Regions:
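Accessory terminal regions of nucleic-acid processing enzymes
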Residues: 72-95, 102, 110-113
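Contiguous, amphipathic alpha-helical segments that mediate oligomerization or scaffolding
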Residues: 1-11, 94-95, 99-113
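Polyanion-binding interface signature
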Residues: 1-83
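Exposed alpha-helical structural elements
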Residues: 49-53, 92, 103
Length: 113
């Protein structure tokens, strides 16, 4: 993970045109909100979307933006830069992300996306 960037993702590709992504994004005025989400893109020209049953599996919140399914992580909402640095340095944040990826992956590996 490149901590100098606002966003990082893991892509599962069937082919060049069909991709399912698990992503993490820091947002907010000072990038103090961390969100995780999933999205499915079936064409380079199409609007990213997530199948309804995928959204139901991962989150109870749906929006119409770039990440139709996402979750704010309460523990990491409005955290201070110093707290963020500590979570990164201790490895707690990367462990949380690894657990989240495993959680998502376990639920998508048998789905026909």
């Amino acid at each position: 993970i490149d901590w100098t960037k606002q966003y990082t993702k893991i892509s599962f590709r069937k082919n060049e045109w069909d991709t399912f992504e698990i992503g993490f994004n820091f947002e907010g005025k000072n990038l103090t909100h961390l969100i995780s989400g999933v999205r499915h893109i079936d064409s380079l020209n199409s609007k990213p979307d997530v199948h309804k049953h995928i959204v139901e599996i991962f989150t109870d919140h749906k929006q119409s933006g770039w990440w139709p399914a996402y979750q704010y992580i309460p523990k990491y909402k409005n955290w201070l830069a110093l707290e963020m640095q500590e979570y990164i340095e201790t490895g707690e944040l990367i462990r949380w992300m690894e657990n989240k990826v495993n959680y998502y992956y376990d639920r998508i590996e048998n789905l026909n996306l």
